[in-house]
Regions:
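Classical eukaryotic N-terminal signal peptides for Sec-dependent ER targeting/secretion
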Residues: 1-22
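Non-transmembrane, solvent-exposed beta-strand/loop segments in proteins
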Residues: 24-233
Length: 233
């Protein structure tokens, strides 16, 4: 994402894992009783703490994107944004036959009742308060596809110096998202789009302007090392 300073001619490059926000809702033709029965059947033996399996028993594929709602600030090496975080995946435990429930194509379920991917902004400067807002809903389709769009207020570490701005006329910031506990064997993350999308009514910033964007997917191996210091009493 390129950000240009409106008063100093400064460009900023901002790399994100993805951006999108488009929800397609099918026409609801069933009755309340159909939805009530479907709700009970789907969640009766459902285990929300167990991740769904992907195709052929492989990892569940999570499509992840961001949608910028407001560009609040870039100061003190911190980029502050208001975003809608779009996530979608398939959970085969949440499938149903259309003909059995009044042709219900979708069902709205509280997000706290179903499995959610533990995807975090890894270079956030804020204290961790939870993976997602439990009072938001997910949209479940009859084929098991799930769409979840929580609202985020993110503060991301973006190191830069005024000398580098004057010398290179740009700043490079990255938003890095990944699963906190899953490896690629159980959860595979994909970016839906290669560019960042913005809400048409996005609140602009007085000093900076977004002029270009980019999204990348990277596969990395993470090695966790523990160091302990022991002193004699």
């Amino acid at each position: 994402m390129y950000l240009v300073s409106l008063d100093a001619g400064t460009n900023m490059y901002f790399k994100v894992t993805g951006i999108l926000l488009t929800i397609t809702v099918g026409l609801v033709t069933g009755s309340f009783l159909d939805r009530k029965d479907l709700f009970k059947i789907l969640l009766r033996d459902y285990q929300k703490d167990l991740a769904p399996a992907g195709k052929g028993g492989g990892p569940v594929v999570v499509y992840h994107s961001l949608f910028v709602n407001a560009f609040e600030s870039l100061e003190n090496n911190v980029l502050t944004l208001q975003t809608w975080e779009w996530m979608s995946w398939n959970d085969n435990r949440l499938q149903w036959d259309l003909g059995s429930y009044g042709d219900e194509k979708t069902l709205i379920i509280p997000s706290k009742l179903v499995w959610q991917p533990d995807i975090l902004l890894m270079n956030s400067v804020e204290q961790f308060t939870g993976f997602a807002a439990g009072d938001l809903n997910v949209l479940v389709y009859h084929d098991g596809n799930v769409t979840f769009v929580p609202i985020r207020h993110s503060k991301t570490l973006c190191p830069f110096s005024m000398e580098s701005i004057y010398r290179e006329n740009e700043v490079n910031c990255s938003l890095k998202y990944m699963s906190w506990t899953h490896s690629s064997k159980t959860l595979d993350t994909h970016s839906t789009f290669q560019t960042v999308q913005h809400l048409s009514q996005m609140t602009p910033n007085r000093l900076w302007e977004i002029v270009d964007t980019k999204a990348e997917r990277n596969a990395i191996d993470v090695l966790v090392l523990q160091h302990r210091s022991i002193s004699r009493n």
